[in-house]
UniProtKB/Swiss-Prot annotation:
Name of a matching Pfam family: tRNA-synt_2
Bilayer-crossing regions: none
rRNA-binding as UniProt keyword: no
Name of the top EC class for this enzyme: ligase
Gene Ontology cellular-component annotations: cytoplasm
Gene3D superfamilies referenced in this protein's UniProt entry, alphabetically: Bira Bifunctional Protein, Domain 2, Nucleic acid-binding proteins
Protein's name in the database: Asparagine--tRNA ligase
Primary site of residence: cytoplasm
Length: 447
């Protein structure tokens, strides 16, 4: 309705009579006063109903009837509420509504998520309703702000949106983590990454990006893993590895700034320390080689405050190692030039050191781990063909990808950012399941 305003906008209407469409999140009261906690998807705030005001507005009989109806409103009843906006210094939100009229739109009976503590499995079983809670609303607002900031960054930096397929006949990375499906009598796989297709896009259109769901059949139950999640991939020609890191750093800082600018209420709801987020914008990200990181971990492995296992050169990092490294530096940290043995086949070797590849993982501080993976891509046809064979992959499945190296191959690089990991980091939340509307995990595919 044209005459409705959003709760988040009431600050612009102090002293004015406004009308809001909302749901009753909670209610309390005594005697002639009722306090309604209203939500509309933009914010939560309090509406105050005073019985004498209702009688003054509607007469004794109708005013009393309206007040009694309000007194018996149940949780999640939908309403139109009319009233005067007032500043309220006692409220975190800073405003409240002095109600002059209320109209019930839709009744709500026996709402299962009552204002008390509930177990996580119960809340996930009722995820379609849990999304209505204050915290989950804030998480979705942070997610939305990151998505919009992504599109804004790519538009301002000359990227073209390039849509890669979700169904594919081959793997981008690890073939053991694929979801396989029948495709008219043949095998097809749900996409792990749009990266290979983005490379084709970059050779045709220049700077390109893709945003969509990807799938990993990882049997992992950690707080960082989902089987279905959203990736923001980018690819660009005529760019080296170091230049790619500059782009990634600018991108992540733009995302954080976008949330600070456009989801401040959500961050306040989540009690996120925004001074830390501002620090990450203002401070250059750290860049540390894989081998230097191993040396650092070995040097500190016997410190009192360490809880990670011993690592040798050639080992991959576990979550405790990533957490310790990023906390040691206190800012997002690029770990560069990993061993080729556990990275993807398409990564270009470090010049003069074929056992290391020109790649980087960006580790977020505060224990949030990897949020970006990127690399410079191999441009030599013969070397790439050999890598495909060395990884036990069928070169025939990658004929089209190899051909990109036959017709005007150029230096190019790119990266992929896991949206839910970025949301978890910026929001300061503990588990990735809250960063997506309907999480898909090894033990959950409903609702």
């Amino acid at each position: 309705m044209k005459d409705l305003i959003s709760i988040i906008d009431v600050k612009d209407h102090v002293g004015e009579t406004v009308k809001i469409g909302a749901w009753v999140a909670d209610k309390s009261g005594k005697g002639k006063l009722q306090f309604l906690q209203l939500r509309d998807g933009t914010a939560f705030f309090q509406a105050v109903v005073f019985k004498p005001n209702m009688i003054e507005n509607f007469g004794e009989e109708e005013g009393t009837a309206k007040f009694d109806e309000i007194k018996h409103l149940s949780q999640e009843t939908s309403v139109y509420v009319t009233g005067v906006v007032k500043e309220d210094s006692r409220s975190k939100f800073g405003y409240e509504l002095d109600v002059t009229d209320l109209e019930v739109i839709g009744q709500s009976h026996d709402y299962p998520i009552t204002p008390k503590e509930h177990g996580v499995e119960f809340l996930l079983d009722n995820r379609h309703l849990w999304l209505r809670s204050k915290r989950q609303m804030a998480m979705m607002q942070v997610r939305n702000a990151i998505i919009y900031a992504s599109y804004d960054f790519f538009a301002k930096n000359g990227f073209i949106k390039f849509d890669s397929p979700i169904l594919s006949g081959n793997a981008a990375e690890n073939t053991t983590e694929l979801f396989e499906t029948d495709y008219f009598g043949n095998s097809a796989f749900l996409s792990q990454s749009g990266q290979l297709y983005l490379e084709a896009g970059a050779m045709a259109l220049g700077r390109v990006f893709d945003f969509g769901p990807v799938f990993r059949a990882e049997k992992s139950k950690t707080r960082r893993h989902l089987t279905e999640f959203w990736m923001m991939d980018a690819e660009y020609p005529f760019v080296t590895h170091d230049e790619s890191l500059d782009i990634q750093e600018a991108y992540v800082k733009a995302l954080i700034q976008g949330v600070l600018d456009n989801a401040a209420y959500a961050l306040e709801t989540l009690e996120r320390d925004t001074s830390m987020l501002q620090k990450y914008i203002d401070t250059p990200f750290k860049r540390v080689s894989y081998d230097a990181a191993i040396d650092l971990l070995q040097a500190h492995e016997n410190d009192e405050d360490t809880d990670y296992e011993h690592v040798e050169h050639g080992d991959d990092f576990g979550s405790p190692h990533e957490t310790w490294i990023s906390n040691y530096y206190g800012v997002p940290t690029f770990i560069v030039n990993y061993p080729a043995s556990f990275k993807a086949f398409y990564m270009k070797p470090v010049p003069g050191n074929p056992e290391r590849v020109l790649c980087a993982d960006l580790l977020a501080p505060e224990g949030y781990g990897e949020i970006i993976g990127g690399s410079e891509r191999e441009t030599d046809y013969d070397l790439l063909l050999k890598k495909i064979a060395d990884f036990g992959l069928d070169p025939k499945d990658y004929d089209w990808y190899l051909e990109l190296r036959k017709f005007g191959s150029v230096p190019h690089a790119g990266f992929g950012l896991g949206l839910e990991r970025m949301v978890t980091f910026v929001a300061g939340t503990e588990h990735i399941r809250e960063a997506i509307p309907f999480p898909r995990m090894i033990n959950r595919i409903q609702p």
